Amino acid sequence: MDLNLYLKQLETLVNIDSGSHNAAGVNKVADVIEGWYRDLGWHVINHDVGPEAGRLMEISNRPADHYDVMFVGHMDTVFPDGTAEKRPFSMDEENVYGPGVGDMKNGDTAMYHVALNADPKVLENLNICMLYNPDEEIGSRYSREKMDEIGRKADIIVVMESAGNKGTRHCFARKGSMGYELEFHGQAAHAGFMFSVENASAILEMGHYIVELMALASREEDTTVNVGLASGGTA
């Protein structure tokens, strides 16, 4: 594997803002990746999953109705527009940095290098697919139906997202996830008269809930809890 080429390609992807809701940015990443594979002579199918997300890419070494092996990655990140400019790709002696460098533009690039470095005999005998998801960070909200349809064509599926940084090599199962949106309503009042008029702080109540929710986390049961976004108040 050509590490210098890998890092150069990774830098290109990391320096493109591609938050899940930035369809244009995700498609810019897709354009770059698609070019890599077309230069190898691979077959590319672009699936439109709606205007709210970038495109889903089904890439294979030949057109096929069945895949022996499928590698899966996602092109979107959790970062807002402008992050790539504020902290672009960088390196030190041990690590690389930048938005999406570990989740999972490293894996997206590695998928290409699987194709680039595959034994020709393997490519001759196996149907291999590289599937690039545009909206994984928001639960594959727009691509899930098509992802499931394509996934059923494969005998083996390997997700190329990083499994961890503490010696983990492969992850065969972990855990599911659930998400909730909670809305709190209070009774508005002037702060200077809070002891003399009826009032109730929705923000204070939300704070109590946050503390209680975080207490549900358990190291022993590997139950993790995260309050990802909280806001409230008007003045």
Predicted feature descriptions by range:
Residues 50-54, 137-139, 165-166:
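Short acidic loop-to-helix transition motifs that present clustered carboxylates
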Residues 144-235:
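Midchain, well-structured core segments that form catalytic/ion-binding scaffolds
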Residues 1-99, 120-123:
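Acidic/His- and Gly-rich active-site-bordering loop/insert found
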Residues 71, 91-138, 178-184, 193-215:
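Alpha-helical metal-binding/catalytic segments enriched in His/Glu/Asp
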Residues 56, 86, 127, 155-157, ...:
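Broad gene-expression machinery/nucleic-acid interaction feature
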Residues 66-68, 125-127, 153-155:
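A general structural motif
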Residues 44-45, 128-130, 227:
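Generic structural signal for residues in well-ordered beta-strands
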Residues 19, 76, 137, 163-164, ...:
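Catalytic metal-binding/acid-base residues of hydrolase active sites
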